[in-house]
From Swiss-Prot:
It is found in: Virion. GO terms for cellular component: virion component. It comes from Rabbit fibroma virus (strain Kasza). Its main location: virion. This is Core protein D4.
Length: 143
């Protein structure tokens, strides 16, 4: 029996099958962003550095996540001048989790998704103090 690799690869990608090697890679990464639909996580994006507000990298990641939804972009970036001045930051790689293609339309839901999307992968990896929230035990906050 001959196995058609192209068909198998297409089947796995279309059904959003996640392999254990992908899970291991995600677990070993330090900075991940969860892209959420209305009901569940759609994609996990891996970045080489943490997104921050002070250097506008947070806005670049958000611009990448919602670039295909004009209503959300207009809500998050009311000024086109500001939107155009921000550089879109693509992830190092992405692992697709589900086929949930619904977008939240409520502004509160969108903002909650954004604020709950940024995660640290490895707990034991050292993280610079300026990436950490205020608090005595950070791992309880982000886990």
């Amino acid at each position: 029996m001959e196995l058609d690799i192209k068909k198998l690869t297409d089947l796995l990608q279309n059904n959003k099958t996640v392999c254990p090697c992908d899970i291991k890679k995600i677990y070993d990464e330090r900075f991940i962003v969860l892209e959420k639909g209305r009901c569940m996580i759609r994609n996990i994006h891996v970045y080489s550095s943490a997104a921050r507000f002070d250097n506008k990298t947070m806005f670049g990641v958000i611009k990448y996540l919602y670039k295909h939804n004009e209503a959300i972009i207009d809500m998050l970036f009311p000024s086109k001048t500001v939107y155009n001045s921000i550089r879109e930051i693509a992830p190092d790689y992405t692992v697709s989790i589900s086929t949930d293609d619904t977008e939240p339309s409520n502004p509160v839901t969108v903002l909650l998704n954004i604020f709950n999307s940024f995660r640290f992968g490895k707990k034991d990896a050292p993280v610079s103090y300026y990436y950490l929230p205020f608090g005595k035990d950070v791992h309880d906050v982000i886990s």
